[in-house]
Amino acid sequence: MLTILVLVIGGYFVGSLSSAIIVARLAGLGDPRTQGSGNPGATNILRLGSKRLAGIVLLGDALKGFLPVWLAQEVGANAWAVAGVGLAAFWGHLYPVFFGFRGGKGVATGLGVLLGFSWSLALAVLGIWLSIFWCWRISSLSALCAAILAPFLAWWLVPDSAIRFAVVLLAIFLLWRHQDNIRRLLSGQEDRASKQN
């Protein structure tokens, strides 16, 4: 029980390490929460003008979702504990203790968590994201579609009910964090990525 508690708390703290804020500050770009879209994520770093830094942020956010889940599995935690660790890492990204509980929307970190849960699930969700983005060039729309379909894919691809339940919660929180994007999509005001991006 103590090991599980340590893993969950550790997952939250790892998730709280905001890659976008750390990378942007080290690169002299300031706080991404006060620039561009105001979201501390890879898309906003790209919007601020650096593909290289956006790639680093994307990788960092995905890894902080994947690594705690992987570690929990390596130490033999049961499915419910693994699910809890994944959710903790995800919530750490959304509400980071190190950055005033003002975090990102969880797309890359959520994908990292899914990869830890099931590589086939992660690939299926990524495939949906890429397909939608290729058609419409709207990052938020891609994330929303992937989040909506993720629980159904989990039901099909993942045998553990604990992991399925965790994926449902991940999807709900990701949709919740995209409320502003949903409003802009409905009003036709959401930004599209340029062809150069």
Curated annotation (Swiss-Prot):
<keyword id="KW-0594">Phospholipid biosynthesis</keyword>
<dbReference type="Pfam" id="PF02660">
    <property type="entry name" value="G3P_acyltransf"/>
</dbReference>
<feature type="transmembrane region" description="Helical">
    <location>
        <begin position="153"/>
        <end position="175"/>
    </location>
</feature>
<feature type="transmembrane region" description="Helical">
    <location>
        <begin position="113"/>
        <end position="133"/>
    </location>
</feature>
<keyword id="KW-0443">Lipid metabolism</keyword>
<keyword id="KW-1208">Phospholipid metabolism</keyword>
<keyword id="KW-0808">Transferase</keyword>
<feature type="transmembrane region" description="Helical">
    <location>
        <begin position="4"/>
        <end position="24"/>
    </location>
</feature>
<comment type="function">
    <text>Catalyzes the transfer of an acyl group from acyl-phosphate (acyl-PO(4)) to glycerol-3-phosphate (G3P) to form lysophosphatidic acid (LPA). This enzyme utilizes acyl-phosphate as fatty acyl donor, but not acyl-CoA or acyl-ACP.</text>
</comment>
<comment type="subunit">
    <text>Probably interacts with PlsX.</text>
</comment>
<keyword id="KW-1003">Cell membrane</keyword>
<dbReference type="GO" id="GO:0008654">
    <property type="term" value="P:phospholipid biosynthetic process"/>
</dbReference>
<keyword id="KW-1133">Transmembrane helix</keyword>
<dbReference type="GO" id="GO:0043772">
    <property type="term" value="F:acyl-phosphate glycerol-3-phosphate acyltransferase activity"/>
</dbReference>
<feature type="transmembrane region" description="Helical">
    <location>
        <begin position="81"/>
        <end position="101"/>
    </location>
</feature>
<keyword id="KW-0444">Lipid biosynthesis</keyword>
<dbReference type="GO" id="GO:0005886">
    <property type="term" value="C:plasma membrane"/>
</dbReference>
<comment type="similarity">
    <text>Belongs to the PlsY family.</text>
</comment>
<feature type="transmembrane region" description="Helical">
    <location>
        <begin position="53"/>
        <end position="73"/>
    </location>
</feature>
<dbReference type="InterPro" id="IPR003811">
    <property type="entry name" value="G3P_acylTferase_PlsY"/>
</dbReference>
<keyword id="KW-0812">Transmembrane</keyword>
<keyword id="KW-0472">Membrane</keyword>
<comment type="pathway">
    <text>Lipid metabolism; phospholipid metabolism.</text>
</comment>
<protein>
    <recommendedName>
        <fullName>Glycerol-3-phosphate acyltransferase</fullName>
        <ecNumber>2.3.1.275</ecNumber>
    </recommendedName>
</protein>
<keyword id="KW-0997">Cell inner membrane</keyword>
